[in-house]
């Protein structure tokens, strides 16, 4: 409903203002339940990974850039909530753009960040088994982002978790899922 739509618009504005590669919001029409936003050019990551004409090197670059885009989001204390290879667009330079923030949230607890990464891990393993080390390549982009961008900035709600803390939580989530699976 309205709350979810308003939340999505607010989060998009927050992260766009911070310079993250996401669609610009042009209008929020509560009456008709619509958000009008910029159309992003690119192909879904799922299509890039399944396209036999795309060289492995380019697929790896798309995965690495996708990991960096997710870390940039997490550095803003925002979890995606529906991270998948359908919700990442890849442009002709293999840069990554995140889309579909309907389930995203401003968050400071490390658990949901780890869950974002775990969902991507599961999707890469299940939907893209032909991509060797897909999650490792994605996570290398995630980790390298902090090295490129430097120290985290404290936000109004506190400090977002460090990449290393999120990686540790990913391992915790993986072990819980394996144990209960």
What is the predicted role of each segment?
Residues 20-63:
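Conserved structural core of kinase catalytic domains
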Residues 30, 41, 85, 103, ...:
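Short, glycine/acidic-enriched loop or turn micro-motifs at the edges of active sites
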Residues 1-5:
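ATP-binding glycine-rich loop module of kinase domains
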Residues 78-85:
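Catalytic-loop of the protein kinase fold
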Residues 87-90:
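Hydrophobic residue at the +6 position relative to the catalytic HRD Asp in the kinase catalytic loop
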Residues 97, 101-181:
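C-lobe/activation-segment region of protein kinase-like
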Residues 69-78:
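Protein kinase catalytic-loop region centered on the HRD/HxD motif
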């Amino acid at each position: 409903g309205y709350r979810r739509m308003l939340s999505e618009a607010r989060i998009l504005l927050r992260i766009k203002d911070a310079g993250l590669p996401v669609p610009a919001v042009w209008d929020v029409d509560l009456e008709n339940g619509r958000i009008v936003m910029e159309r992003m050019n690119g192909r879904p990551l799922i299509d890039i990974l399944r396209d036999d004409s795309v060289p492995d090197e380019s697929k790896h670059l798309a995965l690495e850039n996708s990991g960096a885009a997710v870390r940039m989001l997490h550095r803003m204390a925002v979890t995606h909530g529906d991270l998948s290879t359908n919700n990442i667009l890849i442009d002709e330079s293999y840069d990554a753009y995140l889309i579909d923030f309907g389930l995203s949230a401003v968050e400071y607890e490390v658990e949901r960040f780890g869950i974002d990464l775990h969902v991507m891990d599961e999707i890469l393993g299940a939907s893209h088994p032909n991509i060797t080390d897909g999650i490792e390549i994605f996570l290398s982009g995630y980790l390298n982002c902090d090295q490129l961008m430097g120290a985290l900035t404290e936000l109004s709600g506190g400090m977002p978790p460090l990449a290393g803390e999120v990686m540790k939580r990913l391992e915790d989530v993986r072990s819980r899922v394996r144990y209960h699976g």
